Amino acid sequence: WCTPSRNLTKAYDAEGDTERKNASVVYDECGWSYHYPSDEYAFMHKFPTNVTPVYLMRLAEIRLLHAEALANTDDPGGAADIVDEIRGRAGIGKLTAAQRASADLMREAVLHERRLELAMEGFRWFDLMRYGDDYSKLFEICDGVNIKGSASYDSYFQTRRAMNDNRVLMPVPTSVLEDNTNIEQNLGY
């Protein structure tokens, strides 16, 4: 479904990022669904029809990968220049001096920028796993997307799975373990 979470729409609002929000999120009435009955719910707008071209790779993604590499090799200034370029194209302000000077703050800024720029393009899960981030972020969609915050969610929305380190990686196949005794099974299997 790729439904935008309330947290994502708030992140756009906090940045004053109407350009990317309007390109990614739409509040449209959906009369055919029991769970999304009105225009109070956010829907993905980035690819609005089944004939919309789907980009496999965008320049912004490549630039943000470069910024991430710079941030992880202690060049926060170089990473900030790239992020500021992308933020400028979206019509929002530059990063703070503190973010530009700190490798840790720059890594957070790059991850945040990837979230806003590449929203609903299939990168978020990989970003969170790469950074070993808080797994609860994966379940923000269960928080619902009713902008008024007044909906009561039934069991359809309440289904949750326990997320922990054991569920991030799949088990190594038994045949691989038997063929190479130097390979160890992933935790939890």
Where do the model's predicted regions map?
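Polar, glycine-rich mid-to-C-terminal structural blocks
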Residues: 1-3, 7-10
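Acidic/polar-rich alpha-helix caps and helix-coil junctions
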Residues: 15-189
